[in-house]
């Protein structure tokens, strides 16, 4: 278990050990013999077609759905042996519909679990303010606001803050960004990834979107219909060498292009930038930009070249469409199973 600050656990290893779930009246199990280990501090994305059991698997962790056979452990402790209230208070839970209490202000929504745990009022106030800032909201503007006055993206941020309020070692996120418009969704994804670099929680994240899975996951578990594990690995390894035809079809034919979304401009060999007199009109992007996004910038601008800058805005080099095309060709060849 990873420890940080205040003596609380910040992350926990999660193990699914030959887990099954049978819904009453159904001939086929929803989850069949699922075994995987999620290292402490990583984001594991569960994905698969409809009927793959991804949400069922997630809800067995906090016992919203019972385990029919097998076990799930949190840092070696069986979830089935724990008091269910204690278990759920120690797990952050974020869902698509957010589920904020409409009659409670933002600050009171976030404070719900710390109050149940008996934290001192002063500590709760400090934690609430810290979390409101951490998720990108303004405590002065939003703390005493009711959920009905917030946008969908703001409500999702408050839901995230509430899930983190008691500093749980594990967070369960069931399609948390699925009901938000694409622009806000991308912003929330980026903000959560930056936030995760700070909080380093173990996260189990359910989505139906393979691009979101590739972006968000340290590891991805692809489930077949019937809850059978098809492939569990890093996004890079899944895209490079899918386990079988089902996985290859599921991730899509453009695996090479998807792999470009895993690399930043910082990670590729840049071309020399042209003299300053030849730079006006050239688009630019920071070296932290994904290679796939850099390609989109060039195609959108109609310019085949793009300047690459560091955090201070200094030009470090240049990429071209030809360079990325050659890189794409290389990744596609290596992605052939």
PLM regions and their residue ranges:
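Hydrophobic anchor residue at the start of the ABC signature
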Residues: 160
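Short coil-to-helix segment of the ABC ATPase nucleotide-binding domain corresponding to the Q-loop/switch region
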Residues: 104-111
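The conserved cystathionine-beta-synthase
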Residues: 276-303, 308-312, 319-337
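Conserved signature/switch motifs of ABC ATPase nucleotide-binding domains
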Residues: 148, 166
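Helix-to-loop junction immediately C-terminal to a conserved catalytic motif
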Residues: 62
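ABC ATPase NBD coupling module
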Residues: 78-92, 116
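Conserved ABC ATPase "signature" region
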Residues: 115, 122-141
């Amino acid at each position: 278990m990873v420890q940080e600050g205040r003596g609380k656990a910040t992350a926990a290893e999660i193990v699914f050990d030959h887990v099954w779930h049978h819904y009453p009246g159904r001939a086929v199990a929803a989850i069949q013999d699922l075994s995987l280990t999620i290292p402490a501090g990583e984001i594991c994305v569960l994905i698969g077609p409809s009927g793959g059991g991804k949400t069922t698997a997630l809800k067995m962790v906090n016992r919203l759905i019972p385990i029919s056979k097998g076990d799930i452990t949190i840092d070696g402790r069986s979830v089935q042996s724990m008091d269910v209230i204690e278990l759920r208070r120690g797990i952050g839970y974020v869902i698509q519909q957010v589920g904020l209490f409409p009659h409670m202000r933002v600050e009171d929504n976030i404070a719900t679990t710390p109050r149940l745990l008996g934290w001192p009022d002063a500590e709760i106030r400090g934690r609430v303010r810290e979390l409101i800032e951490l998720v990108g909201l303004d405590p002065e503007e939003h703390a005493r606001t009711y959920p009905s006055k917030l946008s969908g993206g703001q409500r999702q941020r408050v839901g995230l803050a509430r899930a983190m309020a008691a500093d749980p070692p594990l967070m369960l996120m069931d399609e948390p960004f699925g009901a938000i418009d694409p622009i806000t969704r991308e912003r929330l994804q980026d903000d959560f990834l930056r936030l995760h670099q700070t909080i380093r929680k173990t996260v189990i994240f359910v989505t139906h979107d393979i691009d979101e899975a590739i972006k968000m996951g340290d590891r991805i578990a692809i489930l077949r219909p019937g809850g059978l594990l098809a492939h569990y690995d890093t996004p890079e390894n899944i895209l490079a060498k899918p386990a079988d035809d089902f996985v290859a079809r599921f991730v899509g034919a453009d695996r090479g292009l998807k792999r470009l979304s895993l690399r930043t401009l910082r990670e590729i060999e840049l071309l020399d930038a042209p003299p300053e007199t030849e730079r006006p009109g050239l688009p630019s992007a920071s070296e932290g930009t994904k290679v796939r996004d850099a390609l989109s910038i060039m195609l959108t601008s109609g310019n085949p070249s793009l300047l690459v800058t560091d955090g201070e805005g200094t030009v470090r080099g240049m990429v071209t469409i030809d360079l990325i095309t050659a890189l794409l060709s290389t990744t596609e060849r290596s992605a052939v199973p």
